[in-house]
Amino acid sequence: MKKGFDNDKYLLMQSQHIRERIAQFDNKLYLEFGGKLFDDYHASRVLPGFQPDSKLQMLLQLKDQAEIVIVISAEDIISSKVRGDYGITYDLDVLRLIDAFQGVGLFVGSVCITMYTAAPEVEQFEQRLNGLGIRTFCHYKIPGYPNDVARIVSDEGYGKNEYIETQRPLVVITAPGPGSGKMATCLSQLYHEYKRGVKAGYAKFETFPIWNIPLKHPVNLAYEAATADLNDVNMIDPFHLEAYGKTAVNYNRDIEIFPVVNAMFELIAGKSPYHSPTDMGVNMAGNCIVDDAVCREASRNEIVRRYFKALCDQKVSGNASSELFKLELLLNQAGLTVGSRPVEQQSHAVSEKTGGAPAAAIQLPDGTVVTGKTGPLLGAASSALLNALKKLAGIDQEEDLVSCRAIEPIQTLKTNYLGSKNPRLHTDEILIALSSSAAENETAAKALRQLSKLKGCDMHSTVILSSVDTDTIKRLGMYLTCEPVYEEEDRKYHKR
């Protein structure tokens, strides 16, 4: 698969730029860290070559200078807010993040509870952290926030917050999710630092939108697609244009809040170090795109994937999706047509040839497309998976990798003992059967060794797949899209 992004250059440039920003201030920088730190798969999809843990690796280059402060809102603790990608509550995710940071050698200094309320759930969480040896600090609700700047930047505002004691020049402020109070925590710390005579600084690190590529570049449009539920809109930064006469891309929320943030800087430090919200950022990703065409194509595919996901989510939930209108607009802006990708065309062609039965297609790294159809032994996704492995291994498509004799006992187990009504093998089941066959069958072993080559391949199904198949395909690193159609449309209940 072609690379469009130089990851090594990114790690070097990004860490160096943050060091330079630390040096601009009194050797103390509060860095608001947005987006996913450990597993930024969106970035790896739209910038081929970007590693999902690149931001973590960049921080590790600064680990002797850095400490982590994790922020969580008391309101999210009380409401037991759940992080959608992990399915765990925000308070548990704080513990997960602490383990993850410490596990790679990063120093976690403390946890800050924002919007503090002395509710039992909040106090219990605070006690739990203290019992684990994690220091906690409390920041409180400020009446009139964020518009009453004079009150906020005073002893009645930030002054009431506890000062978070930190030890290192770079303080990374991160959180389980948006709306936790990262920026407010940074600005509160600046207020207290200046009171103590330390001329600390603030910066913001977010990968998207990329400020120094065109507004309607597919990479930036793909970011809008990823945040369609938040209704974020990329815009030309008017403050940057006025200050420098140059265009830069930012998004609506940062642009809207900048006058308020700028006024806070002036009250805290006497003068704002920044002329625009873009100035506050430290993102160097745009400088590390080495093949623009590759990144454009990858981003166009991501927009299509986001659209199909929204269609399927709407089908599964039964609720109208407001995201779809935004995504349709983005499809038009990117000049995309649903149904034009080879995996869509060929999966539908197979389905039509088999009387409308479910079908699937996978596009391999060299551009070749292999398909799979529904049969008595295998579902379409499982069939496509085996055919892809055969193609990659140079095995004849007519050769059986797993014999019927090996599959039939598994079907008997499923239907006679495990209560399944579907005898066909799911993707995880056929892979287990293939690995068992590989012990005595060199052809099967050869096919099994190709699994890693499926990472990054696009796959399309003419029906919504089960959660078992979806999870397996995701774990293989493939990019799956499904038509918003159930295999049995007339049924009222559909197991996921």
Positions of PLM-derived features:
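Flexible phosphate-sensing "switch/lid" loops adjacent to ATP/NTP-binding sites
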Residues: 1-173, 189-350, 354-357, 364-366, ...
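The conserved Walker
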Residues: 177-178
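A short, polar/charged loop-to-alpha-helix boundary motif
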Residues: 377-393
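Short HxH-centered metal-ligating active-site micro-motif
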Residues: 391-423
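Hydrophobic positions on the alpha1 helix immediately C-terminal to the Walker A/P-loop
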Residues: 185
